[in-house]
Swiss-Prot record:
CDD domains: F-box_AtSKIP3-like. PANTHER family: F-BOX DOMAIN-CONTAINING PROTEIN, F-BOX PROTEIN PP2-B10-RELATED. Residues 37-83 form the F-box domain. InterPro entries: F-box-like_dom_sf, F-box_dom, PP2-like. One of its GO terms (molecular function) is carbohydrate binding. Coiled coil: none annotated. This is F-box protein PP2-B7. Disulfide bonds: none annotated. Gene3D superfamilies: 1.20.1280.50. It comes from Arabidopsis thaliana. PROSITE patterns: FBOX (PS50181). The gene is PP2B7.
Length: 307
């Protein structure tokens, strides 16, 4: 099957979804004189734009490859306005001009144009249009502040200073944040982003308890798991099969997925999510962890959206 034919089939499926959403029943179609299934040639460009707006930014870019008509339809503000947070104007840190909603969308995806709100950096995931958030280290509740020192950021320029752990036995990081800036009806994964200093020890065989939960929602899901900040050697994976291990990021940092949650709400809701990573039982000496912050991104698994 050719790429164009595949896109046509995909388009027809989307059209069926739109009809269902608009509750356009078969009898409604018949009363309007529609006796045959709609074909692509029957649709005006504005209608094509509207239908594409029900997909995702990734799909929209693929649709643009189908034909000149589709390419033109994808450029419409009708498409990209659906992918932009409705409250974006109140989140922009400074006045900026964009020639189109598409240009605005890709600007909000650019990490160099982060939106800063109360120690939170917000941006849009390019493929899905979902909102992401980074809580900087200054927004975190670090156990016993005198056991941390603030140093020049060794990797990123947008955060000038980050905390480095001094010698301690009691390790605990906690934070809370409102979920109203995140995309509604979306499952999110939570990551702690970190580095290890030149002198770093006390984390190799230590399991940290990580908890992610909705505040005040006792009946809602609570995610609890054990993580390790030390990269496992190949021979260690069997003995650490129940631990979540760190992964290296493209930006030079490392991250550990500490939990997941489902964000039901929308902008202006009052739901809060609480996240913590702690180890207070073994009491072994620890040193040298550098924390960038906690990042919240859409989960890269089936079930990202509720039906």
């Amino acid at each position: 099957m050719t790429k164009t034919r595949c896109m046509h089939v995909h388009f027809r499926k989307i059209l069926q979804r739109v009809k269902k959403t608009l509750r356009l029943s078969a009898s409604d179609q018949q009363s309007q004189g529609v006796t045959e299934p709609l074909s692509l040639g029957d649709l005006p460009e504005e209608c094509i734009s509207l239908i594409i707006s029900f997909t995702s930014p990734r799909d929209a870019c693929v649709f643009a490859l189908v034909s000149k008509t589709f390419e033109s339809a994808v450029q419409s503000d009708i498409v990209w306005e659906k992918f932009i947070p409705p409250e974006y104007e109140s989140l922009l840190s400074r006045s900026q001009h964009f020639s189109s909603k598409k240009e605005l969308f890709f600007a909000l995806c650019d990490e160099s144009v982060l939106i800063n709100v109360s120690k939170k950096d917000l941006w849009i995931e390019k493929a899905t249009g979902k909102r992401c958030m980074m809580l900087s280290a200054s927004a975190l509740n670090l156990s016993t502040h005198h056991t941390w020192k603030w140093i020049t950021n060794p990797v990123s320029a947008w955060l000038e200073t980050v905390p480095e752990l001094l010698t301690t036995r009691w390790f605990e990081i906690r934070c809370r944040t409102n979920t109203r800036f995140l995309s509604p009806r979306t499952r999110y994964s939570v990551y702690i982003v970190f580095l290890k200093a030149d002198i770093c020890y006390g984390f190799a065989y230590v399991a940290m308890e990580a908890v992610v939960r909705m505040v005040g929602h006792e009946l809602s899901e609570s995610c609890r798991r054990y993580v390790c900040f030390h990269e496992a050697m190949e021979w260690q994976f069997l003995t650490r099969k129940n631990l979540v291990n760190p992964e290296r990021r493209e930006d030079g940092w490392m991250e550990i997925e500490i939990g997941e949650f489902f964000n039901e709400g929308a902008f202006r809701n009052n739901d809060e999510i609480e996240m913590s990573v702690s180890e207070t039982t073994q009491r072994n000496t620890k040193r040298g962890l550098i924390i960038q912050g906690i990042e919240i991104r859409p989960t890269k698994k089936p079930g990202n959206e509720m039906p």
